């Protein structure tokens, strides 16, 4: 199985081009579209999305992610080999999914080598179609990454700074995802459940509950959410709009 996560959107030929290129290489590939609606150029958001899919995928799954604002530059295209595979630009996209993969080795994809498998020229602006998609299709077909890449040190790959910080009793947390409901997901997991969550930047104290419907419509709350991260929400409303926050913003939070 191959999963696809991109910021291509659904307007235009890009997703279709990528998928037919993959099927040309591997006609029997089973391709799952996770989303093509990651906010444009948002590597952090894409990393979160890929993490959730990796957590529930079987061993051997190939995850292709293309949120690639550095396409055509010196940034590397890589394959991370483990109990699952990540095929991504080396720009930090692998950061969160890596928490759930037992990494064996990492390979830099060599364009000239992969072109021998595809048979077409590589565009400087569409590596999803010409490099990442084909690499994923080849792996799912049984071609080892060393056939089209070179091994590089595991600790050389780029990672985002997504670790929560604590200053006294205050957490400095980052917004790592906002879903279509406007729920705000923060980069804190494995915490002791509080009774109250204080958002210091907004002078708000929120009840910490298990689900949205435990407060009245329009009321704000904090909860564990379905992804094991601390979440801020409004019942039948948008916490992101209420707080005017976006992915990457930092919030000062106290758990009480």
Swiss-Prot record:
Belongs to the SAM hydrolase / SAM-dependent halogenase family. (R)-S-adenosyl-L-methionine binds at residues 183, 212, 226, 231, 234, 236. Optimum pH is 8.5. Homotrimer. Coiled coil: none annotated. The keyword S-adenosyl-L-methionine applies. The keyword Transcription regulation does not apply. Gene3D superfamilies: Bacterial fluorinating enzyme like, S-adenosyl-l-methionine hydroxide adenosyltransferase, N-terminal. One of its GO terms (molecular function) is hydrolase activity. This is (R)-S-adenosyl-L-methionine hydrolase. Keywords: Hydrolase, S-adenosyl-L-methionine. Catalyzes the hydrolysis of S-adenosyl-L-methionine (SAM) into adenosine and L-methionine. Is likely stereoselective, specifically hydrolyzing (R)-S-adenosyl-L-methionine ((R)-SAM), the inactive form of the ubiquitous cofactor SAM, and not the active form of SAM, (S)-S-adenosyl-L-methionine. Probaly plays a role in preventing accumulation of (R)-S-adenosyl-L-methionine in cells; maintenance of (S)-S-denosyl-L-methionine homochirality is important for cellular health given that the (R)-form is largely inactive as a methyl donor and can function as an inhibitor of methyltransferases. Adenosine binds at residues 7, 41, 68, 183, 234. The record marks 68, 75, 127 as: Important for activity. It catalyses: (R)-S-adenosyl-L-methionine + H2O = adenosine + L-methionine + H(+). Its EC number is 3.13.2.3.
């Amino acid at each position: 199985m191959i999963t696809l996560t991109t910021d291509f959107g659904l307007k235009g030929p890009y997703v279709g081009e990528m998928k037919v290129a993959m099927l040309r290489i591997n006609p029997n590939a089973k391709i799952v579209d996770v989303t093509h609606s990651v906010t444009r150029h948002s590597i952090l958001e894409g990393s979160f999305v890929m993490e959730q899919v990796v957590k529930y995928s079987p061993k051997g799954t190939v995850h292709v992610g293309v949120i690639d604002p550095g396409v055509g530059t010196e940034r590397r295209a890589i394959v991370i080999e483990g109990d699952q595979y990540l095929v991504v630009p080396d720009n930090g996209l692998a950061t969160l999914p890596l928490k759930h993969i037992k990494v064996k080795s990492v390979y830099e994809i060599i364009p000239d080598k992969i072109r021998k498998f595809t048979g077409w020229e590589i565009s400087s602006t569409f590596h999803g179609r010409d490099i990442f998609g084909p690499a994923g299709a080849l792996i799912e077909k049984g071609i080892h990454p060393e056939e089209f890449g070179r091994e590089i040190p595991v600790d050389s790959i780029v990672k985002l700074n997504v670790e929560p910080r604590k200053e006294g009793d205050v957490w400095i947390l980052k917004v790592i995802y906002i879903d279509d409901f406007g729920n705000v997901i923060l980069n804190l997991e494995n915490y002791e459940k509080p009774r109250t969550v204080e958002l210091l930047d907004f002078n708000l104290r929120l009840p910490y509950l298990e689900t949205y419907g435990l407060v009245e419509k329009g009321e704000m709350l904090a909860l564990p959410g379905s992804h094991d991260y601390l979440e801020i929400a409004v019942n039948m409303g948008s916490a992101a709009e209420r707080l005017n926050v976006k992915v990457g913003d930092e919030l000062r939070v106290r758990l009480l």
